[in-house]
Every structure is written in structure tokens, then in C-alpha cells.
Amino acid sequence: LTEATGGIDIVYNRMSAHLRPAIGKLTREGERPQRIRYYRTGWQDDACTSFLMPGMDETTLISVPRQIAYSAPPAGADLTAGLLALTHLIDAMKPELTAPIIAALFMPPMLRPAGLGNERAAVFIAGRTGSLKTSWAQTAMCLYGPGFISNDNLLKMGEGATRNAIMAFAAHAHDLPLLIDNYKPNTGNGKHDFVNLIHNILEGGDRKRSERSGALRDSKPIRCIPVVTGEDLPRDDAASIARILLVTFDWQRGEPNDHLTAAQELSEHLCAVGWSWLQWLRTPAGRTATKAAAKTF
């Protein structure tokens, strides 16, 4: 291209649209990579045969905000070590508390193949400071990317992100859980924002808005399941409570939790478990099993 036009040639007004095809014509056919960019995760289409995830391959580019650290497993991720980490994660608290949350984390990618895309519920992990709810939830989210273990990637409600910002994050996180940390009733607009946020996410999008001309603004669909941590769940709105699985962690009294520590040390391998789950769901056997499960719902 430089030999044909010169490295400092200008692009005239309204001619930029011709630049891409010109580069294509001046590039040898075998040296022209084809890449597709998406701004969300999740199933590529309703056939549910390909799941979009950052790092999945070199020809598919997934651009999502840093704080939703979804990622295909790195080269060193080991499934056996990931399963061991998952076992430690379940045993870190009472299994009757942790098992339902783990099941809820596996649920988002199977809803659309099962035809249950509108049958979503949220998860709220409650507990006082020192119950390790955030540390446990961070580690569990590593099922879908090792970067969730970093505190820098925590999406904090109120003090760290407004309701509208969280809705924007949710629009990128299709068919996956979205961790929202540290809900506090006295931060920001408190329970009012929380109730509206849960309704908006579970109903598939924010309210419709129009422009001054009367035309409707484009709205992005929401297809994630919120997993929220906080000291207590707002009890004033019956409709939102009915759509939330509440799990309460006991205070740990400042004592070390060896199972959680072991899970954290192996957290980089947890994404191998999540990736195996996603790959199985896209197989004929996986799709058949999800549809059979949907019939019993």
C-alpha cells in the first residue's frame, strides 16, 4: 500500500469509505486476514452452535469492558485442576449453600438452547463483613475467566458504578452471569436503584425511550443473570424478591478458610471447567439434554 500511494498521502473529505476496499485490492489475497468483531459474549445466534468468548480464536474479536473479565481458557488451564478447584469452592461453605450458587452460574448459557431465555432469576449472596462472600463469588466467577480473581475487576454497585453503568455492562454479558459486588442500601439511590436494576436485567432491557423526533432509540437486549453480593436483600418489593435466590453466608469470625484458599490458588484452572461446559452445550447431545430438561421445568 505504501509503495502504491505513499506513506503520507492524505485521505480527502468523504473519501474514507473507499479506503477499506482500496486496501483490500492492494493486498495479496493470501495475506488478507478476515476478522469479525463482536461487542458481547454469548451464543452467536439462535442455533446455539458457537459461543462468543474473548480469546476464543484469532479470527473472532470480542470487545467487552475490562471489568467483565470473561475469557476462553489460557494455554496452561487444566481441567483436572479446575475440577479440584470447584470441589474446594463447594466445600468452602456449607454445600447446601454453595451448590445452588454453582448451579446458577452454570445456568445462563443453557437457557437459550433450552428455549428458556425469558425464565431468568437473580442470585443474592448475603452476609456481614467477614463472611467471605465477595472472595467466594470472585473465585466462582473464574469459571468464565481467570481475571475475575482480581479486585480491580470488581463491579461495585453505588460507589463504583451507577445503575445505568451496570446496565451498560450487562448489555455486553450475554448468556453469562454478571457479578455485582457490595450492594448497600444507603449508597447512591440504595434499594430503589437495586429493585429497578433487577427488574430491568431480568426483563431483558431498560425502558424504551424516544428521541425528540418521536422515533424510538435503539435499545440493547440484556441476557445475563445478575449475581449480587451485599449485607442484606431489600425486602420491600415482593416482585423482585420472587425473582431472587437468596443465599446467606455465615460470618467466618476472622478464621482462615483452607478450602477457599485452595480454590483461589487453583482459580486460573476453573475456566477450563466453564469452557468444557460451553463446548458440551453446543454439541447435539448437549442441545438434546437441555431441551429434555426444559420439558420438566
Spans of features found by a protein language model:
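Conserved glycine-centered beta->alpha loop in an early N-terminal alpha/beta scaffold
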Residues: 1-96, 140, 168-169, 173-175, ...
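P-loop NTPase catalytic core of nucleic-acid-dependent motor ATPases
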Residues: 57-156
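AAA+/P-loop NTPase substrate/partner-engagement loops
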Residues: 136-191
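AAA+/SF3 P-loop NTPase mechanochemical coupling elements
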Residues: 171, 210-228
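Structural recognition of the conserved hydrophobic beta-strand(s) that form the central parallel beta-sheet
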Residues: 181, 223-231, 246-247
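Residues immediately C-terminal
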Residues: 185-186, 233-235
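Conserved catalytic/switch belt of AAA+ P-loop NTPases
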Residues: 194-213
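Phosphate-sensing "switch" segment of ASCE/P-loop ATPases
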Residues: 220-222, 237-297
